Amino acid sequence: MYKRQGLAYISNGALVVDVAKPEDTKEVPPCIILKSDGASLYQTTDLATIVEREKLFKPNRIIYVVDKRQEMHFTQVFRVSRLAELVPEDTKLQFLGFGTMNGKDGKPFKTRQGGVMRLEHLIRDINDAVYDKIMASRDEDEETARENAKIIGLSAIKYGDLSNQASKDYVFDVDRFTSFEGNTGPYILYTIVRIKSILKKFGQEIPTAITVPDGAAQKALMLDMTRFSDVFAQASAEYAPHKLCAYIYDLANDFNRFYHETKILAEEDQDKKNGYIALISYCKDILETCIELLGFSAPEKM
């Protein structure tokens, strides 16, 4: 097909397509479609996959989330796709490169034996670390602790990964990622569970009316809650889940500051108390919506 279109030619026995543009700031080599022995390459199969996806799904956008070191490869593939008109002009082909997960030594994360860490083993190690922390600090039966460790462990992994800008390398530190303090998944879950506990103790139908703030902490929490729609829209448009993570970390901090400065359940003014309860209930809804978008959930208690 590429030869019929006059795009491909033989160079040193291989079938190639020139994809360089005058405005390129760095060299973009020709895209090799077939090797000199007729064997296909990743470029060949990726181009075939684009053809098949267009045929089956007619997508508006195709996004490749892969190692950032593959950027040149996909630059070549996308340019061949445009030249050969494999997809309509308005179909967006997008490369989203991610960095590497490194150990404390700054090198790619490995097992103690020096091999590549399997995901199942990573999950097991994280869950065990969380379980140990639960048993060391809380009076909880083993079965419940194990179940909670799975939920909290998943948050540690997903939040730890997604809270970093995708294209940047980051250090995977089990102790830091499983901490219940700081910018971590377990801290976010602990905040949600704290709100659930307050609402349960309130023991009545949750009010819906938020009152005028009577302090700086309450005002800060309310203002941060109003940012949700804008943050969500920006994170979605930019494929940037780390911005959603940064937002819920700020929101969790704002709630905890309000919690420590305010006697929520002990407030004698019923209207004020109802306003507090309505506010933290909405805060919980926002936090739970965000962690659902990030791919994890909160337990009922911690």
Explain the meaning of each model-derived region:
Residues 3-302:
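Non-catalytic interaction-recognition regions
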